[in-house]
A protein has these predicted regions:
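Short hydrophobic/aromatic-rich motifs at helix boundaries and adjacent loops
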Residues: 38-43, 82-83, 126, 156-159, ...
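Loop/turn elements at helix/coil->beta-strand transitions in domains of secreted/extracellular proteins
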Residues: 45-46, 76-80, 105-109, 163-166, ...
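Structural alpha/beta surface segment adjacent to cysteine/selenocysteine redox centers
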Residues: 53, 59-146
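Periplasmic c-type cytochrome electron-transfer domains
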Residues: 7-30, 110-114, 123-127, 145-152
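Extracytoplasmic thiol/disulfide redox context detector
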Residues: 1-92
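C-terminal cap of thioredoxin/glutaredoxin-like
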Residues: 1-13, 17, 52, 145-218
Length: 218
């Protein structure tokens, strides 16, 4: 009888060891709500972040906190992390569509690239002339984001990160992707009552007055 119990317990013990030693940061997926998730899907803590790629405070959080969160909490299976875009402006729409269009495996690397290089890639958009603005506004609405992205130099930014121009154009022409970003923003405001970025939801509960690692960390 004792031997039978030992054999029955062995698979569970093996699973526990595998879970403890697995690097969960390598496990990524898309969510039905439009986010991208990293980590153990059965983690006891579900951390959802809404952020904008053009938001300086979001950049600060990702540089200051995400390495610690990944190493200490996500990699060890304690936290499942999901990122959802909360788009704030045209350049944010363009960058978000480009970061998202190749799926979750590529997304997190591009997310990091957009945050780390935020000042560099957003600067050209601050220098658009009145003539640039009029030219963009004269285009059909479904062509404006793509034209804005090219005007701001995002084609070059993505080319140096392995995205050919044909794929760049394809990503920015994806109407469903644009609509999904719009839905996520609406969901953030209506469901979670968010008013700014970054914003955090833990196990379904919005964290009030929490905008940085100092106020979020356990």
């Amino acid at each position: 009888a004792t031997g039978t119990k030992t054999k029955a317990a062995a698979p569970a013990a093996t699973t526990a060891i595998a879970t403890a030693t697995k690097d969960w940061t390598t496990v990524v997926s898309a969510t039905p709500e439009g986010g991208f998730r990293m980590g153990n899907p059965n983690a006891p803590v579900k951390l959802l972040e809404f952020a904008s790629l053009t938001c300086p405070h979001c950049k600060d959080f990702h540089e200051e906190a995400l390495p610690t969160i990944k190493a200490k909490y996500i990699a060890t299976g304690k936290v499942n992390y999901e990122f959802r875009n909360f788009v704030l402006n045209g350049p944010d729409f363009a960058a978000s569509m480009l970061a998202r269009c190749q799926g979750p495996t590529v997304f997190f690397n591009l997310l990091n690239a957009f945050f780390v290089n935020q000042a560099m890639w957003t600067e050209p958009f601050t220098k658009l002339t009145e003539a640039d603005t009029k030219r963009l506004q004269a285009l059909p609405e479904d062509q404006q984001i793509a034209a804005l992205a090219v005007t701001g130099g995002l084609d070059g930014f993505m080319r140096t990160r392995g995205m050919p121009r044909a794929k760049f154009d394809q990503c920015l022409a994806d109407k469903k992707a644009f609509e999904q970003l719009t839905r996520m923003r609406t969901d953030a405001v209506e469901k979670y009552k968010l008013t700014g970025t970054p914003a955090f939801i833990i196990n379904g509960e919005t964290q009030a007055e929490t905008f940085n690692w100092a106020t979020l960390q356990p």
